[in-house]
Regions:
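N-terminal organellar transit peptides
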Residues: 1-96, 107-241
Length: 241
């Protein structure tokens, strides 16, 4: 049983995040346990990098096929956007009734500061080689062609996400719901009706139901860096005071 908590992508040395490079070894170890009938993965992520999400999703599926092990995924507080994409690596997905599931979409957001810098008397000077190098510069006026280019990229990424969900969930999806791929998110209870998950329950409960009360659950955790260990030790000490 391994856990994938946090934002997907590089978030810094002190903040916990989910990255392919830092999770690869732990995922390999989980699948290398010969006696294990299945690998359980708990996800608690609102999403993040689409690239890292796809890399982790594909690696889990590859390891599952290579080692002939079933993958059972459990959504904790949230498995949304890239978090749900990773969850689709599971042969089965479970969640709490109050978990947040879905958000099958792509988002880009920024600010425009052109009027602000003019108001405070700041001149913006940009020198580029390549006419599109300053695309979506927040200190310049938006260009319709730049917006359209961004939207086209978003549509491609969105379709890739949809393909993963449709391949993973196959006939389980309630495709009559027009909101399914709109970027909307739902509770675990509603997600079950939509076919985004297979059932309601937590990891230990479901694993006992499937493999018996005496099931042995081996836990895998990513090793912490020395600074994170130091801070964690300090927090534990403070809790005991």
């Amino acid at each position: 049983h391994l856990r994938l908590p946090g934002v997907i992508g590089t978030v810094g040395k002190l903040k916990q995040g989910i990255e392919y490079a830092s999770q690869e070894e732990m995922i390999k170890k989980a699948f290398s346990v010969k006696k294990a009938e299945a690998v359980a993965i708990s996800i608690n992520s609102p999403g993040g990098s689409p690239v890292q999400s796809h890399l982790i999703y594909k690696f889990i599926r590859e390891q599952s096929k290579k080692n002939k092990k079933k993958v059972i995924v459990f959504a904790e507080d949230v498995a949304a956007s890239g978090g749900y994409l990773i969850a689709c690596a599971g042969d089965e997905i479970y969640a709490n009734a109050s978990s947040i599931i879905g958000s099958i979409g792509v988002i880009y957001s920024s600010f425009g500061f052109k009027d602000l810098i003019q108001k405070i008397g700041v001149q913006r000077r940009v020198y580029t080689a390549g006419k599109n190098k300053s695309t979506l510069d927040p200190f310049l006026d938006e260009k319709e062609e730049d917006i359209q280019r961004l939207k086209n990229i978003q549509l491609e990424l969105h379709q890739e996400f949809i393909n993963v969900v449709e391949e993973s969930r196959s006939t389980k999806l309630n495709k009559t719901d027009v909101e399914l791929f709109s970027g909307e998110f739902w509770s675990g209870k509603t997600s079950l009706k939509l076919g985004l998950i297979d059932g309601i329950g937590n990891a230990e409960q479901i694993l006992r139901e499937k493999f018996g009360e005496d099931v042995e659950i081996k836990k895998f955790e990513k090793s912490k860096g020395w600074l994170a260990k130091k801070l964690s030790s300090s927090e534990d000490h403070a809790d005991k005071l």
